[in-house]
UniProtKB/Swiss-Prot annotation:
Its cofactor is Mg(2+). GTP binds at residues 30-37, 57-61, 75-78, 142-145, 174-176. It comes from Geobacillus kaustophilus (strain HTA426). PANTHER family: ENGB-TYPE G DOMAIN-CONTAINING PROTEIN, MSS1/TRME-RELATED GTP-BINDING PROTEIN. Necessary for normal cell division and for the maintenance of normal septation. Keywords: Cell cycle, Cell division, GTP-binding, Magnesium, Metal-binding, Nucleotide-binding, Septation. One of its GO terms (cellular component) is cytosol. Pfam families: MMR_HSR1. This is Probable GTP-binding protein EngB. Belongs to the TRAFAC class TrmE-Era-EngA-EngB-Septin-like GTPase superfamily. EngB GTPase family. InterPro entries: G_ENGB_dom (IPR030393), GTP-bd (IPR006073), GTP-bd_ribosome_bio_YsxC (IPR019987), P-loop_NTPase (IPR027417), Small_GTP-bd (IPR005225).
Amino acid sequence: MNVKKAELVTSAVKPEQYPDGGRPEVALAGRSNVGKSSFINKMINRKNLARTSSKPGKTQTLNFYLINDSFYFVDVPGYGFARVSKQERQKWGNMMETYFTTREALKAAVLLVDLRHPPTKDDVMMYEFLKHYEIPVIVIATKADKVPRGKHQKHAKIARETLRMADGDPLILFSAETGQGKDEAWAALLPFVAS
């Protein structure tokens, strides 16, 4: 897909702050530091529209990125970080649950996992949460360039089995460094965002 225009439109913590207009939305979920910002930047050919951070838990709001004036990527707070108070985690959990369970414009979710390691308990819970609410899921296994090519299929199989993925759900190996998986990711996303 040729992205001509991309902008961060709003950062929201509650429904009244979400953008209106009914454009389709794709949520991006994943552990802190799994590479969500790098994924967004690679997908839209920008270096730093989505700010990358080495500090886990940097994204504390739902960030709505309007792409080509036609749909949104919604970057949701990363999970699985230790340095945040239980109260903060609870607040973020409530915010995410409200978004995922009530947002009609939400058409699909991208769950990002780190290809180098088996998915975490939090990854499994997130996948099950999305399936429970019947939100279509595309799993993106990031940092593929950090895994030797000969081991890609083995790591992908471990990810599929750990998440207990449904047969029809795509698992795409992705690298923000090399661009691997970018075309496949767009191919999987377009049916949900083409209006």
